[in-house]
Amino acid sequence: MKNKEKKTVAEVINSMSVKEPHWFWWAGYTFLAHLPFIFAPKYHPTYKIIDDINKEKGPAFVIWNHQSRRDYLFIKNIVEPRKFNMIAGYSEFHKKHLRWLFDKVQVIPKKNFTQDFLFIKLLGKRIKEGATITFSPEGMPSIYGTNQPIVPGTGKFLKHYGIPVYFVKLEGAYLTSHKTDTKDRPGKVFATISKLYSKEDLERLTPEEIEEQINTIFTHDDYEWNKKARIKYKTRGEAAKNMRSLAYKCPKCGKEMMIDQDNILKCPDCGNGCTINDYYDFIPLDDSCVIPESLSKWVEFERGEIIKEIRKDPNYSFSFKCQIGDMPKYELIKDKKNDSVTCGEGTFTLDHNGLHFVGTRHGEEFKFDLSYQIVYTFVMEESSSTFSLYINGEPIEIKPFDIRSVGKALLITEEMHRLHFNIWKHLPNIDYLYKGTELEKK
């Protein structure tokens, strides 16, 4: 009876309002963000201000290339003392350790890669009130050290609101807060803010031109960047931890059996492997090894293989066993290490017809079928060991028993979308992967 009277977490979120953060809580947030050894200072950030947003009058957007879980600290500090409302993933509002802060500093929820009417309502209200809004048009943090293409419709979105847009370029944040390891690896982070668009710029440019320009300025590879910067990151001798979730395929023998231990990434079948040091150098175990120079290049190699395989085989299919998790109905998630609560298991399959799951949820039969027109990539907030999808507006986490399935499923989804729909287009820097296909740019 008690639960019938109590609002669900989703109902509470859907009934929320957002306003300017109270000075008291904003001051506390500022204090926390500057605490040494705990928050931003321990990552040794360097801030460079080309155009000071604090001189801007009226509402504005601040966008940034989303590199890591810690980006909010660097955005907070480079924009200060100006107050703002940050946009964060809807599922993050279900976590107890984040929810209290989100409520105090007035964070706006947004469901990743799907329509969200609550978000539009809250955003419109705050812009009318003259607020500064910070968000990443990529929709989630970097998965393997490079930027993702921005969410389709970003150009139209910015033109619609017609307010100035500032850009914060981050470098080193991915290597600091790596996707394969939930423990931070402090080194150095660089943040630079500049004005990207004035109101007049947005009026003059087409949505397509805006998106092309943002994708261009966002193009960045933290691994390539550090080959020149040569910054040492504190990997604790575990630089390869869980890296098999993304680097799953051996570049030498082609087997999808890569294993990782501490700072070693290796194929158990042919012995091909490497060690990874604190500079994220991939060092072959011996002269016979065939090793990409970074994780980003490794994934690029795997993407090229997937592009060929799905075009070659009209009956292509990939399946794996997994658990699934969802959000508790009446409680927030208390365990910081979990993005959901396990509620069932089954088989996840990807083929030319879409994404499919058959199994159980809360003890009952459960299945879904999704089109690549709707799902073009995965939500991957915390780590690369799991991923999430929205089913009827509700986040469902997929937890493969073999985490090597994550990286492969991600690439299959993205490239099946491009093969069959191509709304979320690839970036120009990987044009060469599509040579000889229908997506080759002549």
What annotation goes with each model-predicted range?
Residues 21, 25-26, 38-212, 229-230, ...:
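Soluble catalytic domains of membrane acyltransferases
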Residues 352, 359-393:
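Low-complexity, glycine/alanine/valine/leucine- and proline-rich hydrophobic stretches
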Residues 231, 236-290:
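Cys/His-rich short segments
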Residues 210-225:
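Short, structured interface segments
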Residues 1-6, 358-360:
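Soluble, non-transmembrane catalytic domains of enzymes that act on hydrophobic metabolites at membranes
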Residues 275-354, 361-363:
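Long, charge-rich boundary regions
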Residues 12-35:
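Helix-enriched interaction subdomains in cytosolic or periplasmic regions
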Residues 393-413:
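Canonical phosphoinositide-binding patch of PH/PH-like domains
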